């Protein structure tokens, strides 16, 4: 009987821990479709577990808006050749990303085109660049 109780408790703990971990890796707060934006790099944070690129984008009225672009972690980006010197403040970049569902200025990066026209998958999927980007 003691074994069944211990096994039951183990299963309950495993399920209780698995749900928050799965939720952390959900992309449910982003829309499913891609959007393209162009802006000027303000900050780059190549960190774990997720890297961030902050860019200034002009809105419909020409007013500058700060956008936060979420990417895979530093280690995943290093594997595709992204280093601390890859993007610099002042660089103009283009991003193909999934916009936040609430409409705020943020997105989950898919592809990023740097100032030299090089395109990389910043979502960690190692996908080939789309032909129309």
Where are these regions (language model features)?
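Short nucleic-acid-contacting surface segments enriched for D/E, G, S/T with interspersed K/R
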Residues: 79-94
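Conserved hydrophobic positions within beta-strands
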Residues: 39-41
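OB-fold/S1-family single-stranded nucleic acid-binding modules
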Residues: 100-124
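Short aromatic-glycine-enriched beta-strand elements
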Residues: 47-58
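Short, structured beta-strand/loop micro-motifs enriched in basic residues and often containing a Trp
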Residues: 70-79
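Bacterial N-terminal signal peptides
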Residues: 8-18
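Sec/Tat signal peptide C-region and signal peptidase I cleavage site
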Residues: 19-23
């Amino acid at each position: 009987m003691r074994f069944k109780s211990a096994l039951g408790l183990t299963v309950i703990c495993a399920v209780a821990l698995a749900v928050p971990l799965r939720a952390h890796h959900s992309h449910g707060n982003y829309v499913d479709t891609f959007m393209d934006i162009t802006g000027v790099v303000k900050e780059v944070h190549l960190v774990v577990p997720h890297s961030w690129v902050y860019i200034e984008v002009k809105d419909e009225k020409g007013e500058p808006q700060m956008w936060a672009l979420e990417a895979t972690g530093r280690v995943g980006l290093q594997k595709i050749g992204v280093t601390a010197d890859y993007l610099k403040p002042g660089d103009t970049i283009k991003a193909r990303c999934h916009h936040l569902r609430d409409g705020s200025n943020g997105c989950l990066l898919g592809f990023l085109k740097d100032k030299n026209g090089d395109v990389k998958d910043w979502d960690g999927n190692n996908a080939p660049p789309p032909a129309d980007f």
